[in-house]
Swiss-Prot record:
Function: Binds as a heterodimer with protein bS6 to the central domain of the 16S rRNA, where it helps stabilize the platform of the 30S subunit.
One protein family per Pfam: Ribosomal_S18
Subunit-structure text: Part of the 30S ribosomal subunit. Forms a tight heterodimer with protein bS6.
Protein's recorded name: Small ribosomal subunit protein bS18
Keyword rRNA-binding annotated: yes
Keyword list, A-Z: Ribonucleoprotein, Ribosomal protein, RNA-binding, rRNA-binding
Family statement: Belongs to the bacterial ribosomal protein bS18 family.
PROSITE patterns referenced in this protein's UniProt entry, alphabetically: RIBOSOMAL_S18
PANTHER family the UniProt entry points to: 30S RIBOSOMAL PROTEIN S18, SMALL RIBOSOMAL SUBUNIT PROTEIN BS18M
GO biological process, one term: translation
Origin superkingdom: Bacteria
Gene for this chain: rpsR
Length: 75
């Protein structure tokens, strides 16, 4: 039986000392969105629950204001 290496959970926001995630910081928000426009879950990114809530709220506000698109796959 092959055991897969499991990556250690790592919260980038805790490590960098970021207190609040800003909806105007597009470069950070784009790292947590898939190419389909979905928000990447915290079990994949390793983000703590407190920051995942702030992140999803910031992404939704940025989408509403038109800073980031709802989806990148317009055909």
């Amino acid at each position: 039986m092959v055991r897969y290496f499991r990556r250690r959970k790592f919260c980038r926001f805790t490590a960098e000392g970021i207190k609040k995630i800003d909806y105007k910081d597009i470069m950070i928000l784009k790292n947590y969105i898939t190419e389909n426009g979905k928000i990447v879950p915290s079990r994949i990114t390793g983000t703590k629950a407190k920051y995942q809530r702030q992140l999803s709220r910031a992404i939704k506000i940025a989408r509403f204001l038109g800073f980031i698109p709802y989806t990148d796959q317009h055909k």
